[in-house]
């Protein structure tokens, strides 16, 4: 566990340093890299901090602020911010220039507002403070899209829900995100009881803007309000939802990994003759018998259930097989028809008495994937695909790890939301679990399959 944690942390730091070098190179090419900025970038200990620092220097489309700067309005914005006793309307008169499309003082002030809004929204330290405030205080609200109630009935628990961002359980967050992606739910951030006020106050205090009755205070307060509502609120909402998604995915992937570990490390039934039954109704129950080493001895299909209802014939065959091959275990897949098949085997046990084998319900997750795989085709080239699944069911009772290692971990079905998380991270995590389990248990070089040996470290 410690080695895996170290491996993940090392990977993160390598990605962080690679991104750091890219950012330093980009800013240096812009001739804007100061020693102070370089020190801040080199000291950044997270990708979020790194991107916040890089934000003002990112190549972006021509903004209203850039147009205003090109029109010579930067000094106006700087002057009002530096000295709030200046009258904005009067000061802006000196920047009226018809050739630059600044026909009135209002045009000049609008340009200055755009410059300050962009400046206020690009401060790395302010972004970090606002993001932390949001994480601590904000609520996440989900509502059903009008007219989608019937179509989205499976999401009814989230039609009207509001919960703290930092405490929402991962499964609930992933369900809401799925509902939003499917167009059933719409989500919003409820910032605080006083809605936007605390965040606007934070922006104002960071830039030393406070309404003290001075000539420019009202105008500057309006700039702060616009900065939060137009630029920062949506930006931070995206960042906070991303944080919820990442935290939920990490938690869910951890649960999936533990589920897979439990499956792989389930106690093996051992080297015993096993009857594997892959239940089915219309298509019948696929039956196979494997010897203690997993070698295939017998295949047949029985039809005890509807619509065929050949119960007695199927029962007689099961009893006959158990006696002839001295079957010690019966592995019954847990798919469609499992309960009815279990009843059939129970009746066979009663007829066999003291020599009856033990019957066990086995998860058949991934058996169909294995059946159609190249590995199964190489192992059983002449065997019908439908029987390969029954062989897998029988063998995974004998030795779960040795059999399940042949199946792609994601195909084993380890969790409800496994398709909603990062597939790259999920695959990496589950592959690590399989490798750890194999190396924890060890392998017998004389009998281990190639897929099992491939998971041995080194």
What function would you assign to each model-found segment?
Residues 2-6, 12, 16-276, 282-383, ...:
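Duplex nucleic acid-engaging cores and interfaces of nucleic-acid transaction enzymes
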Residues 17-18, 22-32, 378-458:
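Long, highly charged, low-complexity intrinsically disordered interaction regions
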